[in-house]
A protein has these predicted regions:
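Alpha/beta-hydrolase active-site loop
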Residues: 109-129
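Short beta-strand/loop motif that positions the catalytic acidic residue
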Residues: 241, 247-249
C-alpha cells in the first residue's frame, strides 16, 4: 500500500462520513524511537460540504487515562468538531497504547520524555506536510505537560507551532513525602511491580497508563528532581520559547490547581501569554473542574468560544515548502 506521507510510512486506516463531518484516521509508523514498533493514530476532522480548502490546522492532545473521545464524542460533540465546524483543520492525536494507537513492545516503560522527543515532532511534521501550514497545538492535562516538555526540550520550535494552549496542565504541585528519599524509594519499588495503572479500576478514565509515566513523575517531584531529562532541562528551556501561549485553569480543579498552571505559563519566555481561570469569581457560571472545563454544556457555551477567539486572533500559519522528516526519521522512497 502506498504511504500517505513522503516522510515515513503512513496508512489511511479509515475514511468515514460522520453526520456533517468527514473523519480520516491515519496510522503513523515513523520508526524514529528506540522502539521500532511504535505506531500512532491521528484522526483528521473536516466538514462534508467544505467548499473551500481546509483551514488552519489545530492539533489536539488528550491527557492521561484518555483518548481521542475526550475531544470528539461518537455523536460528533466536542471541542474537535466545534473547531472543525468553525473552519479549522482539526487533528486529534492519540498517544502510544491509547485509543486507536496500539501498544508498542516497550509500552510499560513509555514516558513523557518519549512522547515529547519522538512522537510530537513526527505528528507535527505529518500535519504540516498534509496541510501546508504551521499548526496550533492544544493540550489537556498530561497532553499539555507533554507539549510543554517538547517545547522546553526544543523538540518543537517556532517552525512547528503557531501557538500553544494548555488546559489544566502543571508540574509544580507535589506531595511532600516524595521529597523524603526512603518514601520515594519505596514508592518506586512498589510501582515497578506493575505494568500499568488502571484507569477503569481507579475511576480515572477509559485508558490505562504505563507505569513508566508514573515513575517519571515521581522523579520530577523527588528530592533534587526537576521537570526534564538528565541531559535536557525542560523547565529552564521554556524561557527560550517565544510562541503565543494560553494557559487555562479551573477554579474547582484540585488535581491541577490554578496557581500551579499559572507557574507553568510564567516559565515561558513569550511576550504573548494569557492566563484564564474558569470560576464564578471570573464571571463564569460555575467553578469548573479538571474535566468539565472542556467536557460539559457549560464549557460548550462559555469555554469553547474563548478557545475559538484565541485561535482566530493568532496569525494564520504560512504556506510551507515540502516538509523534511524530523531528526531520526528516514524519508520514504
Amino acid at each position: 500500500m502506498q504511504s500517505s506521507s513522503s516522510l515515513f510510512p503512513v496508512a489511511l486506516m479509515s475514511a468515514e462520513r460522520r453526520g456533517d463531518l468527514v473523519e480520516d484516521v491515519y496510522r503513523l509508523k515513523p520508526g524514529n524511537s528506540p522502539d521500532a514498533t511504535v505506531e500512532l493514530a491521528v484522526t483528521r476532522l473536516g466538514l462534508v460540504d467544505q467548499a473551500r480548502p481546509r483551514g488552519v490546522p489545530v492539533i489536539l492532545l488528550h491527557g492521561s487515562f484518555s483518548n481521542r473521545r475526550f475531544w470528539y464524542s461518537p455523536k460528533g460533540i466536542g471541542l474537535g468538531p466545534y473547531l472543525a465546524r468553525a473552519g479549522f483543520d482539526v487533528w486529534i492525536a492519540e498517544m502510544r497504547g491509547h485509543g486507536l494507537s496500539a501498544r508498542n513492545a516497550t509500552w510499560r516503560t513509555n514516558k513523557v520524555a518519549d512522547y515529547a522527543r519522538y512522537d510530537l515532532p513526527v505528528i507535527g511534521a505529518f500535519v504540516k506536510e498534509l496541510s501546508g501550514q504551521v499548526p496550533h497545538w492544544i493540550g489537556h492535562s498530561l497532553g499539555g505537560t507533554t507539549l510543554a516538555a517538547a517545547l522546553g526540550g526544543q523538540y518543537l520550535g517556532e517552525s512547528d507551532a503557531a501557538s500553544v494552549a494548555l488546559f489544566g496542565s502543571q508540574v509544580s504541585r507535589y506531595y511532600w513525602p516524595l521529597k523524603i528519599p526512603p518514601v520515594q524509594w519505596a514508592g518506586r519499588l512498589l510501582l515497578r511491580s506493575f505494568e500499568h495503572i488502571s484507569g477503569s479500576r481507579f475511576k480515572r478514565g477509559p485508558e490505562d497508563e504505563p507505569v513508566g509515566v508514573a515513575l517519571e513523575s515521581m522523579r520530577w517531584h523527588g528530592l533534587f528532581g526537576r521537570f526534564g531529562e538528565r541531559d535536557n532541562h525542560w523547565w529552564a528551556g521554556l524561557a527560550n520559547v517565544r510562541l503565543p501561549v494560553l494557559a487555562v485553569a479551573a477554579e474547582g480543579d484540585h488535581q491541577d490547581p490554578p496557581w500551579a498552571c499559572r507557574l507553568l505559563l510564567e516559565r515561558f519566555g513569550s511576550g504573548q501569554r494569557q492566563f484564564l481561570s474558569l470560576g464564578r469569581r471570573q464571571g463564569f457560571s460555575e467553578d469548573f473542574d479538571h474535566v468539565r472545563m472542556l467536557i460539559s454544556t457549560a464549557a460548550q457555551e462559555q469555554v469553547w468560544p474563548r478557545v475559538l477567539d484565541w485561535l482566530q486572533q493568532r496569525p494564520v500559519g504560512e504556506s510551507l515548502p515540502a516538509a523534511e522528516p524530523p531528526q531520526g526519521v528516514a524519508a520514504e522512497t
